[in-house]
Amino acid sequence: MEMWQKVLLSIVGGLFTILLVVWIAFQVSPRPGAFLINRLFAGKAEITEPTKFQAAQQQVVVTKDLAYPSTHQENQFDLYLPKAKAPVLLWIHGGGYVGGDKAGMVEFATRTAADAHVAVVAMNYQLAPDSQYPNQLQQVDELVHYLQRHATDFPQLDLTKIFIGGDSAGAQIALQYATVQTNPDYAKTLNLTPRITKELQGTLSYCGPVDLQQVAHEQSQDRFLKFFVKTVAWSLLGTKDWQHSAQLQQASVAQHVTASFPPTFITDAQNFSFQSQGEALVQKLTALQVPVTSLFFQEALNHEYQFDYALPEAQTCYQQTIAFLKEYQ
């Protein structure tokens, strides 16, 4: 055999070995895939409407990286305060449970604090797969408990009026926490005690997977979407057989809401998002006679469209969000 043939075989063999090791790594653990997805959500948040953002900055005091006691990591929150005491909007960021950060909420939180006169609490939580379900829910509870116990340290927070919302994965976490507050039997299954049954004024879901059980039955032909769903679910629930996990059904908000659920704002998009899940929750809440404001579009908008304020649809969403918060304060 010629020398060049031996070299070529060595290179091919080496590449095959590397590919085999990578393939095995993706089969035995969600971590490689979770790392790649996490990178998709990394990077500095882009300000999409600078003029209005800068105007809002003049009306809002921002304090970043405050800590709340937690048994988990990433236990920090940012506080966006208008000039006077205000109701609270607790916001939970998205990122597929494996990525994202509260820093990405800066434009939304600043403008919302100014325009709706609410104090926005933007929280972080430890990401999957390092922290698995329902730890993220527990961290929301830890933050709420901390704010209640230290109310005198935050005199500008009107903790008698609390909204809770989120985007993407954060919306599921937020609305599940609201379900805990309004369904005592459900709260017991999660070993949580309702803390804000009277204080909870409303919930907001931006492109949230609020009926998670649907993903177990979807037959998407999109390879990336299949990879994304499999990786996220495996990372969050801790099992490769996540489709048959009892926790998947438990985390499906639409299956556990009751007539005691608070007024809710729901929006979603068609592309790479969870519009059918949002529609399922709208249908359920409407049947329960819970006030619900929904915003869906025929246009092919992308997941998390609502934060791109250059889009007219995002501006409509923002205007309706402010109106919702003002109505139910």
Where are these regions (language model features)?
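Alpha/beta-hydrolase superfamily serine-hydrolase fold, recognizing
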Residues: E2-Q329
